[in-house]
């Protein structure tokens, strides 16, 4: 069973400054480079190590394409203003419809992924998704945006998710981060997506502050500690971790909504990555299955957990 960690003191006030920046939009090349490097560090011959090595290859392909794709269009000021006026995400994922630009991106990414070492089942899934017609691709995108993926097609959906991450990270990078604002509980201020995990950062002037990380576009947004990352409740918040673990990876549980979201402490380990380490800490998810809490975060490479 996970080890429960008691909460003590006023942890909502932790941080070097009282007002941390609300949001940080991603630098796509650095985002995927860091993710790939961390996946490589976590990979190995045993357990899920080979799978993590495969995911490193996906992140490397995503990074490589960031410098090869045409530059994304600048943010439409009228559309941005309308979204901000109504507390809506400027890159509303629920309104996204695959267009010719996205289909070109998927073709190039899937082509690059042909060169990534992978087991036969993963290769078969890639071949299948490359043959998918426009209607099938549109349906897969819609399911991913709804966080609803058929169990029997998880591998195919993971490839489409990788393309969506690349598309949305590039789009989010063009947003004016200082103008972003909260859009709802457990929602990214850039695209409206759910968090993949949260971080206690060690940044200058914000050290000790907590940020949620978007599973889709990679935007980070400030979220005070001892507060549920899904429903924003401050009641019944507890922490659980693997016994005798490093103390840097914990599951934050909420009695109000019954969810848990992982929290990584970069102050103690700067190599932690909100996306890669979410997959790398699968053991914590397996232990949390023995509790009454369900996973509240979304990770397309952990579908089924």
Language-model region placement:
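N-terminal alpha-helical interaction blocks
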Residues: 18-176
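Short N-terminal helix-initiation segments at or just after the protein's N-terminus
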Residues: 130-132, 154-162, 195-202, 289-291, ...
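Cys/His-clustered metal-coordination modules, chiefly Zn-binding fingers
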Residues: 170-289
């Amino acid at each position: 069973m996970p080890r429960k960690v008691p909460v003590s003191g006023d942890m909502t006030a932790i941080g070097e400054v009282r007002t941390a920046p609300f949001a940080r939009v991603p630098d796509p090349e650095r985002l995927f480079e860091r993710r790939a490097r961390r996946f490589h560090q976590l990979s190995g011959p045993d357990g899920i190590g080979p799978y993590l090595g495969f995911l490193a290859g996906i992140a490397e392909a995503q990074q490589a394409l960031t410098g090869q794709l045409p530059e994304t269009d600048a943010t439409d000021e009228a559309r941005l203003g309308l979204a901000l006026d109504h507390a809506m995400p400027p890159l509303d994922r629920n309104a996204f419809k695959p267009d010719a630009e996205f289909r070109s991106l998927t073709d190039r990414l899937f082509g690059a992924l042909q060169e990534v070492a992978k087991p036969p089942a993963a290769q078969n899934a890639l071949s299948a998704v490359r043959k998918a017609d426009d209607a099938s691709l549109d349906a897969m995108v819609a399911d991913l945006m709804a966080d609803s993926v058929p169990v029997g097609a998880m591998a195919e959906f993971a490839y489409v998710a990788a393309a969506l991450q690349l598309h949305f990270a590039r789009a989010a990078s063009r947003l004016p981060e200082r103008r972003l604002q909260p859009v709802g509980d457990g929602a990214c201020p850039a695209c409206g997506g759910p968090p993949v995990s949260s971080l206690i950062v060690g940044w200058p002037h914000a050290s000790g502050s907590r940020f949620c990380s978007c599973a889709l576009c990679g935007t980070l947004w400030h979220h005070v500690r001892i507060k549920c990352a899904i429903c924003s409740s401050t009641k019944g918040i507890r922490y659980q971790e693997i016994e005798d673990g490093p103390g840097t990876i914990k599951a934050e549980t909420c009695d109000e909504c019954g969810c848990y979201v992982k929290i990584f402490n970069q102050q103690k380990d700067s190599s932690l990555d909100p996306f890669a380490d979410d997959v790398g800490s699968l053991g914590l998810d397996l232990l949390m299955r023995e509790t009454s809490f369900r996973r509240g975060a979304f990770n397309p490479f952990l579908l089924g957990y």
